[in-house]
């Protein structure tokens, strides 16, 4: 151990996707420790990537010296894709096991994480085993959380099969579970070793789940992605899904440029602050109100995207009331959200409890209620605070304007 100077100590496996260094500076009375971590991984986007999963995994497995895999999926996605994914991974020579959990937001819980820890222990999973999250945003969040906490961190791969997972949940390294008092209150940052996004998987989703993910794409458009809003306006939304067998194909074709654009914008915004230490985050557009709705209804009345859509409409109306957004812009946003079959109004019976959630957020953020508000179709700003009167007026304005925009 050095007594003076600064000594870097490199991670022992510099070939790993997760590299780091530690530097010491000090002497007999103590040390200053500086730790740097570097994570490197690829996000592979394209139709047919699921069929190439084994090929895509080989370099990841080699870098981690991984020798086995555990797929974690849910009872909706598993019957569709678990067999294919198992075959593709088995082709690499790695033994594969599969764990199936109940689908839906209630599985994103510490209780479910505990059950998965128990399963991994019972299956003698070691640090050279990698996990595969096969599913939507809930699976990606949950499996990432289990991966970072089990044995102090094992590798994992996100194979996102839902639009919400593809444009949001699988991207950025945020992992965690919900608490009974709020969404995503338990978790951290732990990047995957690979993200695989095959838009063809969207054809097997219920239309409601596709719509759920579209809300996040609208959010990304509004915070500053020129042209994305217009692409969303042109999306073909069939009322006959899935009876109209061509409808999923048309929608997937329309989403072709939207998925990488949404991912790219999210990563661009995360680049200067990947661990989100700054509370002023444009990516929170619609989420303050949205999380309030989800918590108030115990995560069962609204899908995440539906809650974000209502939150987006509400803060846009607040922005209109403040003179930051034109009524025409508000109407255009309401028109798109409703075209995508997303809800836009805070129900009367939930207005009070959502406001109380915002008040709680104010306490957590040192007395400041930070809200992201659109000022134009591709530009948003962050406002430091609003009043109860402004919130109530916005709820009324959305309720008033929405019928004519539907």
UniProtKB/Swiss-Prot annotation:
<feature type="binding site">
    <location>
        <position position="216"/>
    </location>
    <ligand>
        <name>Zn(2+)</name>
    </ligand>
</feature>
<keyword id="KW-0547">Nucleotide-binding</keyword>
<dbReference type="GO" id="GO:0046872">
    <property type="term" value="F:metal ion binding"/>
</dbReference>
<dbReference type="InterPro" id="IPR056179">
    <property type="entry name" value="DHQS_C"/>
</dbReference>
<comment type="similarity">
    <text>Belongs to the sugar phosphate cyclases superfamily. EVS family.</text>
</comment>
<keyword id="KW-0456">Lyase</keyword>
<protein>
    <recommendedName>
        <fullName>2-epi-valiolone synthase</fullName>
        <ecNumber>4.2.3.155</ecNumber>
    </recommendedName>
</protein>
<feature type="binding site">
    <location>
        <begin position="105"/>
        <end position="108"/>
    </location>
    <ligand>
        <name>NAD(+)</name>
    </ligand>
</feature>
<dbReference type="InterPro" id="IPR050071">
    <property type="entry name" value="Dehydroquinate_synthase"/>
</dbReference>
<feature type="binding site">
    <location>
        <position position="304"/>
    </location>
    <ligand>
        <name>Zn(2+)</name>
    </ligand>
</feature>
<feature type="region of interest" description="Disordered">
    <location>
        <begin position="1"/>
        <end position="21"/>
    </location>
</feature>
<feature type="binding site">
    <location>
        <begin position="201"/>
        <end position="204"/>
    </location>
    <ligand>
        <name>NAD(+)</name>
    </ligand>
</feature>
<feature type="binding site">
    <location>
        <begin position="137"/>
        <end position="141"/>
    </location>
    <ligand>
        <name>NAD(+)</name>
    </ligand>
</feature>
<feature type="binding site">
    <location>
        <position position="174"/>
    </location>
    <ligand>
        <name>NAD(+)</name>
    </ligand>
</feature>
<feature type="binding site">
    <location>
        <position position="287"/>
    </location>
    <ligand>
        <name>Zn(2+)</name>
    </ligand>
</feature>
<keyword id="KW-0862">Zinc</keyword>
<feature type="binding site">
    <location>
        <position position="183"/>
    </location>
    <ligand>
        <name>NAD(+)</name>
    </ligand>
</feature>
<feature type="binding site">
    <location>
        <begin position="161"/>
        <end position="162"/>
    </location>
    <ligand>
        <name>NAD(+)</name>
    </ligand>
</feature>
<dbReference type="Pfam" id="PF01761">
    <property type="entry name" value="DHQ_synthase"/>
</dbReference>
<dbReference type="GO" id="GO:0003856">
    <property type="term" value="F:3-dehydroquinate synthase activity"/>
</dbReference>
<dbReference type="InterPro" id="IPR030960">
    <property type="entry name" value="DHQS/DOIS_N"/>
</dbReference>
<dbReference type="Pfam" id="PF24621">
    <property type="entry name" value="DHQS_C"/>
</dbReference>
<keyword id="KW-0479">Metal-binding</keyword>
<dbReference type="GO" id="GO:0000166">
    <property type="term" value="F:nucleotide binding"/>
</dbReference>
<keyword id="KW-0520">NAD</keyword>
<keyword id="KW-0170">Cobalt</keyword>
<comment type="function">
    <text>Catalyzes the conversion of sedoheptulose 7-phosphate to 2-epi-valiolone, which may serve as an alternative precursor for aminocyclitol biosynthesis.</text>
</comment>
């Amino acid at each position: 151990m050095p007594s003076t100077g600064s000594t870097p100590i490199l991670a022992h496996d510099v070939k790993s996707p997760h590299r780091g260094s530690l530097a010491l500076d000090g002497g007999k009375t103590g040390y200053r420790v500086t730790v740097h971590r570097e994570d490197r991984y690829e996000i592979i986007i394209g139709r047919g990537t699921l069929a190439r999963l084994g090929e895509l995994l080989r370099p990841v497995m080699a870098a981690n010296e991984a020798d086995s895999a555990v797929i974690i999926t849910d009872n909706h996605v598993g019957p569709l894709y678990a067999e294919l994914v198992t075959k593709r991974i088995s082709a690499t020579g790695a033994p594969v096991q599969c764990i199936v959990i109940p689908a839906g937001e209630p599985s994103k819980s510490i209780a479910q994480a505990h059950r998965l820890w128990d399963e991994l222990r019972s299956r003698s999973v070691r640090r050279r085993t990698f996990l595969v999250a096969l599913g939507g945003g809930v699976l990606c969040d949950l499996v990432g959380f289990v991966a970072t906490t089990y044995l102090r961190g094992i590798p994992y791969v996100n194979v996102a099969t839902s639009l919400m997972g593809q444009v949001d949940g699988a991207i950025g390294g945020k992992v965690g579970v919900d608490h009974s008092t709020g969404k995503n209150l338990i978790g951290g940052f732990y990047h995957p070793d690979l993200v695989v996004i095959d838009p063809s998987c969207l054809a097997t989703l219920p239309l409601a789940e596709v719509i759920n993910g579209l809300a996040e794409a609208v959010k990304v458009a509004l915070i500053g992605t020129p042209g994305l809003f217009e692409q969303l306006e042109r999306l073909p939304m069939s009322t006959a899904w899935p009876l109209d067998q061509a409808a999923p194909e048309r929608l997937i074709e329309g989403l072709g440029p939207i998925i990488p654009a949404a991912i790219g914008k999210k990563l661009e915004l995360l680049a200067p602050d990947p661990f989100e230490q700054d509370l002023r985050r444009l990516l929170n557009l619609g989420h303050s109100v949205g999380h309030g709705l989800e918590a108030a209804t115990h995560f069962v009345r609204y899908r995440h995207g539906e809650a974000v859509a209502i939150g987006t409409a509400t803060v846009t109306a607040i922005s209109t009331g403040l003179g930051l957004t034109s009524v025409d812009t508000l109407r255009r946003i309401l028109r798109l959200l409703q075209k995508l079959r997303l809800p836009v109004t805070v129900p009367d019976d939930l207005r009070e409890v959502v406001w109380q959630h915002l008040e709680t957020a104010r306490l957590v953020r040192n007395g400041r209620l930070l809200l992201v508000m659109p000022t134009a179709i591709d530009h948003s700003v962050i406002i430091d605070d609003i009043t109860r009167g402004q919130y109530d007026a916005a709820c009324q304005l959305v309720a008033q304007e929405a019928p004519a925009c539907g």
